[in-house]
Curated annotation (Swiss-Prot):
It holds the Pfam family Homeodomain. The gene is unc-4. Belongs to the paired homeobox family. Unc-4 subfamily. The keyword Nucleotide-binding does not apply. Residues 56-65 have a biased composition (Polar residues). It comes from Drosophila melanogaster. This is Homeobox protein unc-4.
Length: 588
């Protein structure tokens, strides 16, 4: 404390420890009971500074910047201590600088921090002046740290530092020992380190918060203008899930370049697509989609429904070796198909007419059918050219509308059955020994021309009953023709020779029937029409047609040899009129 005597000279007295402790308690009491608002701090500081400088000329100003903390409870202590005139030499300049920096950073938004000059008069203006290297450095923005959650902790540390500096100044004023000053300096240094670490923590967290609040840095997305202003690439999975890509519009130059590239290759690789995208200022994904759409347009135009791993349905047909089928073979197959269609149509028409009881002339029916279809343009003369292929009207290998099987094929042994019911000759005594072989399972006689060994349509020369199945009265279209002895001998010779087989699958039935007919001497000549009459060709003169057993066995052996030749795989395929081997074999 400063005491003035009546003589007017000022003397300093050292008070005892009790007085000093009382002064310290008084200071702490002032710290606890202070309720000043932050807005009053600069005004009080200004008044205290002016009062101390005017009333006590020799008094020294204290570093009041320590106590300029926003809302700190040490503002009253700064006023009372500054009125005592503490010497500036008692406070370390570095500590004062650190405390002012902390106070400037942690000040709230509404508090104006005074400049450096009035508080730091240390006698070294070149270093600590307003334009010095310490004070000229930029400091943190006080507004950015005002609302930070760590500002209260930093304010508490700065308040503790201010209290330490106040006690240090009072100790210097009362003349404390050097050891006490060293202890106070150590505590001051510790507080300064705590404040510095707090400031560093605040700065680090502020930088992290700013980095998180900023938009992500990076180059702008390519082609965002053509995607309707949406950021990011349209192929990104996360962005594609949130939004829909807008339609891409190509200009004429881009379309010309894409068409030129498509004419060179319908399936460009990734490198070619990337080069096109860079040159045309497009995305690679848009180029790939354009090529997909262009290929789909080509397939739609050519009607090629191509699936994965197989050629288009209208591709050029190939053989098993992979080479295309020759044109002449294709033409031969087409002609055979048309002839088969013609024969089936005529046969169907003939059956309809026979069902109505009308006598059918197949040649006239065929000529009428061809003339009608020539007028329509669906038939031509080239379709009638015979390539040496025998056309089976019934369709021996193809399924027809009637359920035929090989089980009923031995029954079809009749001659060329057909129309009216002419009688085949006298006496009905032999009718019991004759076979009704011109009938199908349902009693229809229109298929009687499909006897074994034949192969032509009704009315054709090959549809006449073979000589081994005819008697003296041959039945053809319900009309009987008498035969003389020479013709009978020729028919007998032809009967002994084996006949070529059109369908080898029925060879066993033919062989068995031939041997049984030769042994028993049966001749079947019955043909039944759909009319009321039946044409019975009865057997006459059995002794003229009986054969010796030796000739029967010889003919059977010849038939077996022919059967072995005819049932080989190649011969079977050649005998099929619609097979490739048959077409090639007949063309040569």
């Amino acid at each position: 404390m400063v005491l003035e005597t009546s003589e007017g000279d000022t003397k300093k007295f050292l008070t005892n420890n009790n007085n000093s402790s009382a002064s310290r308690n008084n200071n702490s009491h002032n710290n606890n009971n202070n309720n000043h608002s932050p807005k009053e701090i600069p005004e009080e500081t200004g008044r205290s500074s002016s009062t101390s400088s005017n009333s006590i000329p020799n008094a020294h100003r204290t570093n009041a910047g320590q106590h300029l903390l926003g809302g700190s409870p040490s503002s009253a202590c700064s006023t009372s201590v500054s009125g005592c005139g503490m010497p500036s030499e008692g406070l370390h300049p570095t500590a004062a600088l650190q405390l002012y920096a902390a106070a400037a950073q942690l000040a709230p938004n509404g508090v104006r921090v005074p400049p450096w000059g009035p508080f730091l008069q240390f006698g070294v203006p070149g270093v600590f002046g307003p334009n010095g290297p310490f004070l000229g450095r930029p400091r943190f923005d006080a507004a950015s740290a005002g609302g930070h959650p760590n500002s209260a902790a930093a304010a508490a540390a700065a308040t503790q530092m201010a209290a330490v500096n106040a006690s240090n100044a009072f100790a210097n004023l009362t003349g404390l020992s050097a050891a006490a000053l060293r202890n106070v300096s150590a505590a001051q240094t510790t507080a300064v380190a705590a404040v510095a670490s707090t400031v560093a923590t605040i700065q680090h967290r502020l930088m992290i918060g700013n980095r998180q609040s900023l938009p992500p840095a990076g180059p702008p997305s390519e082609g965002s203008n053509e995607d309707g202003g949406f950021p990011g690439d349209g192929d990104d999975d996360s962005s594609a899930a949130k939004r829909r890509r807008s339609r891409t519009n190509f200009n004429s130059w881009q379309l010309e370049e894409l068409e030129r590239a498509f004419s060179a290759s319908h399936y460009p690789d990734i490198f070619m697509r990337e080069a096109l995208a860079m040159r045309l200022d497009l995305k690679e994904s848009r180029v790939a989609v354009w090529f997909q759409n262009r290929r789909a347009k080509v397939r739609k135009r050519e009607h090629t429904k191509k699936g994965p791993g197989r050629p288009a349905h209208n591709a050029q047909p190939q053989t098993c070796s992979g080479e295309p089928i020759p044109p002449n073979e294709l033409k031969a197959k087409e002609r055979a198909r048309r002839r088969k269609k013609l024969a089936k149509a005529i046969d169907r028409q003939a059956r309809k007419l026979q069902a109505k009881g009308i006598t059918v002339d197949l040649e006239a029916l065929k000529a009428e059918y061809i003339s009608q279809h020539k007028a329509n343009g669906t038939f031509s003369d080239s379709d009638l050219e015979d390539d040496g292929i025998q056309i089976d009207v019934v369709g021996g290998t193809d399924s027809d509308d009637e359920g035929d099987s090989d089980a009923v094929s031995p029954v079809r042994l009749g001659g060329g059955g057909g129309g009216g019911g002419g009688t085949g000759g006298g006496g009905g005594g032999g009718a019991s020994s004759s076979l009704h072989c011109g009938l199908d399972g349902d009693g229809d006689s229109s298929r009687a021309g499909s006897f074994i060994g034949g192969g032509g349509s009704l009315g054709s020369p090959s549809s006449v009953a073979p000589p081994s199945m005819l008697s003296n009265g041959a039945v053809q279209f319900g009309k009987l023709e008498p035969m003389d002895g020479n013709e009978s001998e020729e028919r007998d010779r032809e009967r002994d020779s084996p006949k070529p087989l059109l369908f080898p699958a029925k060879a066993f039935h033919q062989l068995n029937l031939q041997s049984s007919q030769q042994h028993h001497g049966l001749v079947v000549g019955q043909g039944q029409g759909s009319g009321s009459g039946h044409g019975h060709g009865h057997q006459h003169n059995h002794h003229q047609h009986h054969l010796h057993h030796g000739s029967a066995s010889a003919s059977a052996a010849a038939a077996v040899a022919n059967l072995v030749h005819q049932t080989s795989p190649i011969s079977m395929r050649r005998s099929n009129p619609f097979s490739i081997e048959s077409l090639l074999f007949n063309n040569t």
